UniProtKB/Swiss-Prot annotation:
It comes from Mus musculus (Mouse). Residues 1-15, 159-166, 216-225, 272-339, 388-397, 447-457, 507-556 are cytoplasmic. The chain crosses the membrane at residues 16-36, 138-158, 167-187, 195-215, 226-246, 251-271, 340-360, 367-387, 398-418, 426-446, 458-478, 486-506. This is Solute carrier family 22 member 20. Belongs to the major facilitator (TC 2.A.1) superfamily. Organic cation transporter (TC 2.A.1.19) family. Residues 526-541 have a biased composition (Basic and acidic residues). It is found in: Membrane.
Length: 556
């Protein structure tokens, strides 16, 4: 008997599973706010050099004659953001005047920013423009570095300490570091706290998904995994609305961080995974948790009959194979695990590269940043509805593979779209982003189902590490556009297509298949599958031989 049979006996997808899933997915939704927050808090508005200290700058009419005399214009007729005339050139106000040969200099006295849309951002506060413009991207890279470190750290800790402890700590760390970020007075301190915030991303996402999957019967796992994607989509829509209402970056930062204190407080009620407790010799606590589940699901009588012996019998065959400690090498220890791990490394990396390459720089589309953020969030809804349907009725492997290949083709096709068709290019990019978001959430669930319970968190943590590496590489690939504009879209699209092909060729289907508890059980399942296929193949060969022999005998 499998552990999922016990969950079915205690109510299946009952009230406990619904409440538990909702309480875990709500924080996951707000994580999207932090991931894409710098689209708003680090937005770079139009700007130009501040005038010399001995020059009196009018307080109104920033596009008036004084600006034409003090700031050179670029090829589009806009003020140069990083240069100014050494001396005001009033002669340029005359018709047909030329600025050729006029001496210019850098912005020695700072910058003037257009505050009509953003009253304050970190770019304005610390002048992250011109020579310092790379620091803006550095801050986001540091956040993604934190996500990378968190994936490596929390994945291993969760398999050793349980799912709940790292999750509770991550809520607290994000609440504190997020609020502290809103009060820092220097860019270096801002980066430190952004790093700490990034670490919690993996701690929350990975442990929330594992808890949902491990408390959910087989028939409810697909919908639960897709709901995680919808929560992330909801978070992007919330960010667009909150950022539109709260424009100052410090208040916006605080607004999306404070709710995690509430999540920290109620997370103490969340029970630990009984699967993990049983596999680590804590059967009594597992029984207590299961009895609470039974009571909440209206199966109090069934819960009272539970004992440690009864509960342990559901995974008794697995206890003999459980290792008391695990290491990263366990992800490569056996052929079946090694095949899954190597394939997922490429899939997570490729998905992340393409996803963040599209979603982390909304200003490049030339439309309202709030509108683009909302569009990039809304597009996930129909995409995930399709993903939900195909995952339930077709399977995980076909769904993930199809979305990755489709997204890659759309990203490549986008580079052939004329640049003056900004709206059409944005819509096409949004469709590609929707496919990538759907494949992302599908592969989260797929990965959790592919790995056995004893190393599930470590496997998901390691896979997430590869995704974070992709997030770090994405900005570097974007810079290849300075060499050739076709390199970034080709790189993003090609990696996505290759990842989709790898899923189709090397991973097995997990739809309606009970979760595997140990590495040994996974190896047995793979061997049994091969034996069954070999038997079927031999039967077909014998049948074909007999079919071919009959006419020959009749002829003779």
């Amino acid at each position: 008997m499998a552990f999922t049979d016990l969950l079915d006996a205690l109510g299946g997808v009952g009230r406990f599973q619904l409440v538990y899933t909702a309480l875990l997915l709500l924080p996951c939704g707000l994580l999207a706010c932090h991931t894409f927050l710098q689209n708003f808090t680090a937005a770079a508005p139009p700007h130009h050099c501040q005038h010399p200290a001995n020059y009196t700058e009018p307080t109104t009419n920033v596009s008036g004659v004084w600006l034409r005399a003090a700031i050179p214009l670029n090829q589009h007729g806009d003020p140069e953001p990083c240069r100014r005339y050494v001396e005001p050139q009033w002669a340029l106000l005359k018709p047909n005047a030329s600025s050729h040969g006029v001496a210019t200099e850098g912005c020695k006295d700072g910058w003037v920013y257009d505050r009509s849309i953003f009253p304050s951002t970190i770019v304005m506060e610390w002048d992250l423009v011109c020579e310092a413009r790379t620091l803006r991207d550095l801050a986001q890279s540091i956040y993604m570095s934190g996500v990378l470190v968190g994936a490596a750290l929390f994945g291993g800790l969760a398999d050793r300490l349980g799912r709940k402890a790292p999750l509770v700590w991550s809520y607290l760390q994000l609440a504190v570091s997020g609020a502290a970020t809103a009060y820092v007075g220097s860019f270096s301190a801002y980066c430190v706290f952004r790093f700490l915030m990034g670490m919690t991303f993996s701690g929350i996402i990975l442990n929330s998904l594992s808890l949902v999957v491990e408390w959910m019967p087989t028939r409810g796992r697909t919908v639960a995994g897709i709901l995680l994607g919808f929560s992330f989509t909801l978070g992007q829509l919330i960010l667009a609305g909150v950022a539109y209402l709260i424009r100052p970056w410090r208040w916006l930062q605080f607004a999306v961080s404070a709710p995690f204190l509430v999540f920290f407080l109620y997370s103490w009620w969340l029970p630990e995974s009984s699967r993990w407790l049983l596999l680590h010799g804590k059967a009594q606590q597992a029984v207590q948790n299961l009895q609470k589940v039974a009571m909440m699901n209206g199966r109090k009588a069934e819960g009272e009959r539970l004992t440690t012996e009864v509960v342990s019998s559901y995974i008794q065959d697995e206890f003999a194979s459980v290792r008391t400690s695990n290491s990263i090498l366990d992800l490569f220890r056996t052929p079946a695990i090694r095949r899954v791990t190597c394939c997922l490394m490429g899939v997570w990396f490729s998905n992340s590269v393409a996803y963040y390459g599209l979603a982390m720089d909304l200003q490049k589309f030339g439309l309202s940043i709030y509108l683009v953020q909302a569009l990039f969030g809304i597009i996930d809804i129909p995409a995930m509805l399709v993903a939900t349907t195909t995952m339930i009725y077709v399977g995980r492997r076909a769904t993930v593979s199809s979305f990755l290949i489709l997204a890659g083709l759309m990203v490549i096709a986008n580079m052939f779209m004329p640049e003056d068709l900004q709206t059409l290019r944005t819509v096409q990019a949004a469709l590609g982003k929707g496919c990538l978001a759907s494949s992302f959430i599908c592969v989260y669930l797929f990965t959790g189902e592919l790995y056995p319970t004893e190393i599930r968190q470590m496997g998901m943590g390691f896979a997430s590490v590869n995704a974070r590496l992709g997030g770090l590489v994405a900005p570097l690939i974007t810079t290849l556009g300075e060499i050739s504009p076709v390199l970034p879209p080709v790189s993003f699209g090609a990696t996505s297509v290759l990842a989709g092909m790898a899923v189709a060729c090397f991973l097995t289907e997990t739809r309606n298949v009970p979760l595997v508890e140990t590495i040994a059980a996974m190896e047995r399942r793979v061997k049994q599958g091969r034996s069954k296929r070999d038997t079927e193949q031999k039967s077909e060969e014998i049948s074909l031989q007999q079919l071919g022999a009959s006419p020959l005998k009749e002829t003779i």
